[in-house]
Amino acid sequence: MPHQPSIALIGTLDTKGDEIAYVRERLAELGTRPLVIDSGILGEPGTSADVPRAQVAREGGHELDRIQAAGSRGAAVELMAEGVRAVCVRLWLEGRLDGVLCLGGAEGALLGAAAMHALPVGVPKLIVSPSASGRRAFGPFVGESDVLVLHSVVDILGLNPIARAVFDNAAAAVAGMAREAGSAVAGLAGTSVGITMLGHTTPAVMRIRAALERAGHEPVIFHANGVGGPAMEGLAAAGALSGVVDYTLSELANSLLDGLHATGPERLRVAGAHGLPQVIVPGCVDFFNQGAPETLPAEYRARRSYYHNPVATLVRLEPDEMADLGRVVAERLNEARGPVRVLAPSLGFSLADVEGGDLWYPEADAAFLEALGDGLRSDIPFELVDTHVNDPAFADLVAERYLALVAEPTSTT
């Protein structure tokens, strides 16, 4: 008998009862087993739930009446999100969850997203929301995971021809994914190596990827755009990577200057905290990301900059900022419990950081390299190589150093 996928269907049943009931029927007609999880807080549920809201609250460590008295809508949503997350993780661990579908407005979508972010990459995840549109930020919905977001076109209030068409497609999408999905990424993936990259380090990373593949490793490339680096580190923490070549650290530069690709304070800490072998290259530390040239803040207009595309400008860090960044990189690497090697090119960190290039500023690069070298623990090897970050010979050296590092006996610091 073919496997019948189980789909967690998340919604606030006090406001979305009819819509959840409709999608539950569609999922059942499509041959799946829907499990309705009530993420509602205040009103009375409009349909039945497999996991009622009181149980959801308790699985998150709270009583429903406490959440209802939280004092603000935001605080209540945060507390209920803990329960929704706990329920879905439990179902996944019990082998009773093959996909997740959430219907909701802004808060309802965030409640579903909280659960989806806790599940491994490869588990089908779909949010249907009117908030998935316009200029709204999608980061809170997608996070660092593989969440699909579908605009509902109409608000999720009542059943009408447009709503039914969208809901039918959503049910078919998650049912199809759950039936045909590949394996979820959970557990150590043998010799998978996480590598960070941007367009300005692509030539080198392509060469490193080829070298590691020839040696029997499986490179996994992450776009270091404010999400890619944390996504790589999240997978490292989950045991899905066996090592890291962090070749592109521009997210740290963005965090220092509040650029568009900024990340949180855990960047460059996670892999080391889990003892994974790391080879670090400061690719793209010379710039931070801003929007279209005409939108640059006044304080940046006199700086060196690179016109990347009509909606992206790369702005050069000044020497004092580069020195600060070098110290940040050193401090975070010094926390590592696993083996680390640092290789740094002395003749430029990006395609535009070359003699005659728009971002060429050797004094600034020197300030970074000096601060990095001075700040690293004495037992972390630091190689300063007289070349550019995209030099083929440098890329080959980085690949060699990684292969040598993972061949060494495992040790933690």
Residue ranges and their predicted role:
Residues 16-26, 35-51, 188-226, 230, ...:
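Glycine-rich phosphate/diphosphate-binding loop of Rossmann-like nucleotide-binding domains
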Residues 12-18, 98, 102-111, 132, ...:
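Gly/Ser/Thr-rich loops at beta-strand to alpha-helix junctions
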Residues 102-121, 205-209, 354-361:
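Short Gly/Thr/Asp-enriched flexible loops that form oxyanion-binding sites at enzyme active sites
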Residues 47-96:
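Phosphate/nucleotide-donor binding subsite
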Residues 99, 111-141, 148-151, 220-224, ...:
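Short, acidic/small-residue loops that bind anionic groups at enzyme active sites
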Residues 2-44, 99, 109-118, 122-127:
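N-terminal phosphate-binding or glycine-rich loops at protein starts, especially the Walker A/P-loop
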Residues 8, 15-34, 259-413:
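C-terminal non-catalytic interaction/assembly regions of soluble proteins
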Residues 66-70, 135-200, 324, 384-386:
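Cap/lid and interdomain-hinge subdomains that line or gate substrate/regulatory clefts
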